[in-house]
Amino acid sequence: MSIQVLSEKIRALNSDWPDRWVSLRDVFKSCHERLGIAVPFDQRTSRLLAGGLSVSNFVEHSCKNMARKNKEPGYHSRLHTAIVLESLTALLLEQRQIDKLNTQSLIREEILLLVAMAGHDAGHDGSRNSSICQLESRSFRLIRPLLEAAKCDERDIYAIKRIIWSTDPTLYEKLHNGARTTDFDLIKPSWQAVLCQEADILASAIPEFEKQLTLSLADERSKVYPISAEGLLSPGGRKYFLTHYAKFSSPAAR
């Protein structure tokens, strides 16, 4: 994967945030167009794409409302979601090259992943899970009506829920271990989850961005979890992240 190209995208997003910010909908649209998905090929895929545009628009405006009240999280913000979408796009493009696929082979699966990650932190208020998939479940509940309004296929809605739930960090190790028992295939739910997990934390594993992202997360947590925030900034905090969360199993990420 071209870390250089992805880094340029992340730098551009950082430079625009927040004063020259475009919108998450524009980032989502740019990502699916770079994947060559400008015109979907069937009704199911078209509806999925419409759902993704609606989800990204919803997250943009709900976060903007939070920002007006000075309540948008410092880390789990629109900027984070945009970086995740760019990271996922980079991984998908790299995987295409590895698999020698044309742009039409897995269009629905690729859009499915983009839609899931556009909404994976919907409604995030900077808190942490007190039970497994607590915040992830809330995010899905917020975006489900939008997917239903776009008449997305129930199979796709279920898959989006599954992917969003898989972004609970406590599930990373189990899901990566399970996926590694099979060959990579984007059609497989386990590998869909892994690729999205990788996109969620990829930027934090790039040395150029690790410090600022860690500071943003620590600042977000300091308001409610000061001890956790201190741990992130401690010498062992980075090591813990690399050991427990920075897992990269897909061919595209290795």
Language-model-derived ranges and their functions:
Residues M1-F41, Y75, S87-I107, G119, ...:
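Divalent metal-dependent phosphate-bond-processing catalytic cores, especially two-metal-ion Mg2+/Mn2+ enzymes
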Residues I37-A67:
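Short alpha-helical hairpin
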Residues S56-S87, G123-S127:
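Active-site flanking loop/helix segments enriched in acidic
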